[in-house]
Amino acid sequence: MEYNEFEIISKFFKNHQKKDKNQIKGIGDDSALIKIPKNNLLAISTDTLVEGKHFLKNITPKDLAYKSVAVNLSDLAAMGAKPTWITLSITMPKSDSVWLKSFSKSFFKILNKYKLNLIGGDTNSGPLSITLSIYGLIEGKNALLRGNAKNGDLIYITGNLGESAAGLSLLQKKTFLKNVKICNYLIKKHLKPIPRISEGIALRNIANAAIDISDGLISDLGHILKNSKCGADINLNTIPISKILTDNFKIDEYLNWALNSGEDYELCFTISKKNIKKLNVAIKKKIIKCTCIGYITSAEKGLNLIQNQKKIIFKKSGFNHFI
Amino acid sequence: MEYNEFEIISKFFKNHQKKDKNQIKGIGDDSALIKIPKNNLLAISTDTLVEGKHFLKNITPKDLAYKSVAVNLSDLAAMGAKPTWITLSITMPKSDSVWLKSFSKSFFKILNKYKLNLIGGDTNSGPLSITLSIYGLIEGKNALLRGNAKNGDLIYITGNLGESAAGLSLLQKKTFLKNVKICNYLIKKHLKPIPRISEGIALRNIANAAIDISDGLISDLGHILKNSKCGADINLNTIPISKILTDNFKIDEYLNWALNSGEDYELCFTISKKNIKKLNVAIKKKIIKCTCIGYITSAEKGLNLIQNQKKIIFKKSGFNHFI
């Protein structure tokens, strides 16, 4: 069955959630109306996912809904913001009720998991693409910014890098693995990245700068360095790479995935040495799992990759949507 | 020349405007960070414009930039909100510098006119489409909502209806007119609608309910009636239609444009009789130009169109993106 845009909203996207007390108007008026609690900043991030660029043509509506929200949540995580509201603009070739049912079920599942309320949006017909704007609150003034890294800071990464790219490579049949269990694990890492929300909130009072790894470590760390006017020395031997990758792939392959492929949605952050104790407490309490991969230097030193105590030459290339 | 996404942002969309004092972070971090002034509500609206649906394939980048912002501003106008910030997600087949230069010039022109600051966004490659999220402030608590119309309220329309649809019909070569000057005037009405921002702000303390005419009077007034649980009697003889339309087109044609075609972006609002004096003051001060077209009744009476004192039968059909 096909629906028009008003039917799509009322059938699949309206009244699925309780209003929160700061949401004066949600879906169904010319705009949403919200109230920002005192002493809070509002973090706003927006991301478009286009078929064939950010997701494969054969992605299921369930996986698409999860990933589009997770990717946007990751931007809030990198600011240390608490997720609150979201708007969804969806453009799709036809209003297929089976597709919409599956999409909206998965969409509200992740929204409810992260206590996000849908407050508005738009539905259109056209080639499949999704734009989400996501809103988070930051109590006080300590947001995690890209531009606050300081010379001498230590650089850390949450989790592991490269598994998402391995999963994508398997999905695209560029890589093959006999072990179905491992295949499925890596594909899941690509399709269901976990936004590091609680880590980001915990890091607000520990880290100086942060970014999420969406375009690849080299490219994303590059943003921190550019905005902070710093350089960095990275020890390649310490890059967190899972045993699954080191056991099943060649070093060139997984290092390239870890450095140049994106979509891990781990956080890369810098902390001053005086905050190491605080970080260790958070690690001990299992709020955060992270690895030190190097340190911030001065801008004129640039970004250096060191492997087995030797500087190595690398090709700096993150994910670029226009190549 | 072609650019990658970071070059597009830094060359065409960054540092074109002064930061306002409530904008802690704009473009260039994982999210924007804003501070909402005390006693203000934040209005948020989002709209996607897709090639071939909301704009014709041969639209110029200049017209596209203007219209996408104007359409979003119109949603804020219908809430009585003061425009403040905007985010832009643009998907385009290639990063053509001539196109981008023209688009961004026109984009910042309308932004500056309405004191809107660009605080973030996203660029992608794919079939041309634009998603804007727009943010406005409402001092106090009096937003113009769709659901506040009361039985006995008078119904008004700002400006005239139908000219945008006439312009579209000319652009699509469904209609022909010999007079080039009139043709260009009507096409301009379609391409450059004026969002009724100052009218919306003035109406916050006068009107009960409001909506902007994006999908057609019948459809949009229908939203007020549905949300307010009311009916309405509309006198077709009073629908504001310009002399240009009545002189150059048949009555069936222009009435259909006025009732069923959208994109006039005028405001339809209801006021209680006790506020007529206040409205007349605003009309006298030239803050608002509007026409009374009928009144609100009870829900069981439904929506009735009256022409020459007779009820007429009409086909209720606004613009539906999925038909």
Swiss-Prot record, chains A, B:
Residues bound to Mg(2+) 4: D30, S45, D75
Q: A GO biological process this protein is involved in?
A: thiamine biosynthetic process
- Output the Pfam families linked to this UniProt entry: AIRS, AIRS_C
- All disulfide bonds of the chain are none
| Entry binding sites for Mg(2+) 3 | D30, D75, D212
* Its job: Catalyzes the ATP-dependent phosphorylation of thiamine-monophosphate (TMP) to form thiamine-pyrophosphate (TPP), the active form of vitamin B1.
Task: Give the top-rank taxon of the lineage listed in the UniProt record for this protein.
Answer: Bacteria
Q: Please give the InterPro entries that the UniProt record associates with this protein.
A: PurM-like_C_dom, PurM-like_C_sf, PurM-like_N, PurM-like_N_sf, ThiL-like
**Name this polypeptide is given:** Thiamine-monophosphate kinase
Extra remark: Reaction mechanism of ThiL seems to utilize a direct, inline transfer of the gamma-phosphate of ATP to TMP rather than a phosphorylated enzyme intermediate.
Pathway this chain belongs to:
Cofactor biosynthesis; thiamine diphosphate biosynthesis; thiamine diphosphate from thiamine phosphate: step 1/1
Q: Which UniProt keywords apply?
A: ATP-binding, Kinase, Magnesium, Metal-binding, Nucleotide-binding, Thiamine biosynthesis, Transferase
Gene Ontology molecular function, alphabetical: ATP binding; magnesium ion binding; thiamine-phosphate kinase activity
Please list the residues that bind ATP: G121, D122, R146, S214
Question: Entry's PANTHER family?
Answer: THIAMINE-MONOPHOSPHATE KINASE
Return the EC number: 2.7.4.16
Q: Which NCBIfam families match?
A: thiL
Q: Which HAMAP family match?
A: TMP_kinase
Q: Which family does it belong to?
A: Belongs to the thiamine-monophosphate kinase family.
Write out the residues that bind Mg(2+) 1. Answer: T46, D47, D122
The organism of origin for this protein: Buchnera aphidicola subsp. Schizaphis graminum (strain Sg)
